[in-house]
């Protein structure tokens, strides 16, 4: 619907309602169409590993939006993008679900869920899903530290990415006494 914006959906598995794909919608300035497609595939495969690890019942998927021709994540018409995403998810008829990822927001998901039910993003909840995701990471770290009798202040942590989730992880680690936290 808008020039300079392409939506790609990758699903790492069969397109079936019994085990639908799930992964967030990412909005970036990819140099090429191939780069966007490859990223979508790589991320969908990674999501399958996450879903298998936690036995969620989902396979991996990812929605990747490529901005080009002068478009950026800040200039994209969000309403039109959410309409396009909703149309694609509706066409896939429950075999792929999405939520927030890089450069998409809860407000975007609120708009998307008005048009399709295939959104997992804490809609209508007081829970900040970014904080909830970060806290699962912190809980895992604390569990491992407890199991192996490790002192967080003696460990070194590298947090990949310092966005909506990573920043909460990094701040929480420091708050828990970690002395060496890198982003």
Label each residue range with its predicted role.
Residues 1-124:
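N-terminal ligand-binding/catalytic initiation module
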Residues 128-183:
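Glycine-rich phosphate/diphosphate-binding loop of Rossmann-like nucleotide-binding domains
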């Amino acid at each position: 619907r808008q020039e300079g914006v392409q939506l790609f959906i990758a699903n790492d598995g069969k397109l079936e309602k019994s085990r639908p794909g799930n992964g967030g919608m990412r909005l970036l300035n990819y140099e090429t169409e191939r780069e966007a497609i490859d990223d979508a595939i790589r991320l969908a495969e990674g999501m399958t590993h996450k879903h298998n690890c936690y036995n969620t019942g989902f396979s991996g998927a990812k929605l990747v939006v490529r901005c080009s021709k002068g478009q950026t994540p800040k200039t994209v018409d969000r309403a039109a993008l959410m309409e396009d995403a909703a149309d694609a998810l509706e066409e896939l008829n429950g075999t792929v679900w999405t939520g927030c990822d890089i450069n998409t927001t809860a407000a975007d998901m609120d708009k998307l869920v008005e048009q399709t039910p295939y959104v997992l993003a804490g809609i209508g909840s007081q829970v900040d899903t970014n904080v909830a995701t970060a806290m699962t990471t912190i809980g895992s770290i604390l569990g491992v530290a407890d199991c192996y009798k490790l002192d967080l202040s003696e460990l070194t942590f590298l947090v990949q990415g310092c966005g909506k989730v990573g920043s909460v992880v990094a701040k929480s680690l420091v708050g828990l006494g970690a002395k060496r936290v890198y982003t």
